[in-house]
Amino acid sequence: MQHLDEIIANATAEIEQAGSLVALDEVRVQYLGKKGHLTLQLQGLGKLDPTERREAGQLINKAKQTVQTLLGERKDSLQTAELEAKLAAETIDVSLPGRRIENGGLHPVTRTVERIEQFFGELGFSTESGPEIEDAFHNFDALNIADDHPARTDHDTFFFNPDLMLRTHTSGVQIRTMENGKPPFRFIAPGRVYRNDYDQTHTPMFHQVEGMLVDENVNFAQLKGILHDFLCNFFEEEVEVRFRPSFFPFTEPSAEVDVKRKDGKWLEVLGCGMVHPNVLRSVGIDPEKYSGFAFGMGVERLTMLRYGVNDLRAFFENDLRFLKQFK
């Protein structure tokens, strides 16, 4: 029989030299396989005297256990090294520049609405909202709009039936707010409105902000002062403003507000006036005790003037080349 110490020494050296799991398995077969060195040693026990056979068998089994232990340890070592190499190959290189995530921006119409809300909020005006599908009372009757007014025709208003329609202004919010409370009132009502019109300066849906203040001893001079300050704040410069007499069914007296452009021409930007007594009566407010003023402005129109946009329809076409300019 080959000396066991020599077999173990050779096995130990070959196990340590095995550089892969495949090579290690070849070593295992060489020593523990059917024709392996230690297997042959066991098969040779029959040639020994009975007195030597038992001791030799114990030594051979001990040698097998030693080799199996060495094989197991080397296998664990190789598997760990293989895993570490794989992880190293998959490691993210943090020194590489990352992909830039492009931030979005507020739509220019949203920017304008927020700017308006901020200005009037600092003056104590709350922000109110209401339904976009409105009934005839809140959209027309309570606002002193006569039955034969052009706004009541299909050419200007989207009707569902004679009493339900898409609101043509946010004035209905003013009526609902006054119905649900008691004077004094001080609020603005921004929102989407709908009119049957579409061209370079009109779209079927657009945004309005209407405002109202109702209290005792409210006068036109207060209205003029607030709107002048608002326009100067909005355009971020001192602007020349004029109030031109006009007519609105829900205000008396009424005026349209113009600003003077740099080329000397006047441009209309909003409408306003003192709340008509009939409007106050429609919501149960005594016009002998209370008075008020109201104003309304088209958000897209103000946005066009502020940013120099010529076509209102550009705000709704979702052209990123256009919208990215307002980030």
Curated annotation (Swiss-Prot):
UniProt keyword list: Aminoacyl-tRNA synthetase, ATP-binding, Cytoplasm, Ligase, Magnesium, Metal-binding, Nucleotide-binding, Protein biosynthesis
Cofactor section: Mg(2+)
InterPro entries named among the record's database cross-references: aa-tRNA-synth_II, aa-tRNA-synth_II/BPL/LPL, Phe-tRNA-synth_IIc_asu, Phe-tRNA_ligase_II_N, Phe_tRNA_ligase_alpha1_bac, Phenylalanyl-tRNA_Synthase, tRNA-bd_arm
Residues that coordinate or bind Mg(2+): 252
Catalytic activity: tRNA(Phe) + L-phenylalanine + ATP = L-phenylalanyl-tRNA(Phe) + AMP + diphosphate + H(+)
GO molecular function, one term: magnesium ion binding
Compartment(s) where it occurs, according to its Swiss-Prot or TrEMBL record: Cytoplasm
Pfam families xref list: Phe_tRNA-synt_N, tRNA-synt_2d
One GO CC term, this protein: cytoplasm
TM stretches of this protein: none
GO BP annotations listed: phenylalanyl-tRNA aminoacylation
Documented EC number(s): 6.1.1.20
Cofactor note: Binds 2 magnesium ions per tetramer.
Subunit structure: Tetramer of two alpha and two beta subunits.
Family affiliation: Belongs to the class-II aminoacyl-tRNA synthetase family. Phe-tRNA synthetase alpha subunit type 1 subfamily.
NCBIfam families listed in its UniProt record: pheS (TIGR00468)
Protein name in UniProt: Phenylalanine--tRNA ligase alpha subunit
Species for this entry: Aliivibrio salmonicida (strain LFI1238) (Vibrio salmonicida (strain LFI1238))
Gene: pheS
